[in-house]
Amino acid sequence: ILWATGACLFVRTATYKEVGGLDAGFFAHQEEVDMCWRLRSRGYRLVCVPQSIVYHVGGATLNAESPRKTFLNFRNSLLMLYKNSREADLKHVMRIRFWLDYIAAAKFLMEGHIQNAKAVYEARKAYHQLKPEYAPKRKENLEKSTLSTIPELMRDSLILAFYLKRKRTFKAIKDRR
């Protein structure tokens, strides 16, 4: 697997420290995905134990409809992509992401969620402001990466596969990498 939810994630302390742990700048959204991506790119295996039972109160930090939650999800995922995407992939990924973000903002507007639409724009603005601060982290992540590709990373967008290609299960997506 590429990542595991922070609600049920175990990482050895030495390994956690080695990869820099959770990014404190991500507060409450996507920090575990970012860390797992760094773990995976440095050759660590992430495993799932399907027999596990976990109880988690999702959305306890921020309500699902909260513009702050929308802001953090969009900003943090942009920063995560910037921090971890290979140089060869970054421009392509960000170009697609640009359009997907504005489609999402338009959808929020059409649904009457004006503050969530604004949050998407604000997240993009914050990403561009924070990008120079994250450049050293990106450099370190790419330098310490031991894998040229991560098999679990999808080549195409999961969002496009779901909405445009009508792929409703992960198994239905044939070419993940």
List each language-model region with its residue ranges.
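A short, conserved alpha-helix in the catalytic core of glycosyltransferases
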Residues: 2-53
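Active-site-adjacent helix/loop segment of glycosyltransferases
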Residues: 45-139, 144-151
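Low-complexity, compositionally biased segments
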Residues: 34-37, 92, 104, 159
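Glycine-rich phosphate/pyrophosphate-binding loop
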Residues: 1, 10, 135-177
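Intrinsic disorder/low-complexity signal
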Residues: 31-33, 100, 155, 174
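Aromatic-residue hotspot detector
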Residues: 22, 27, 116, 162-163
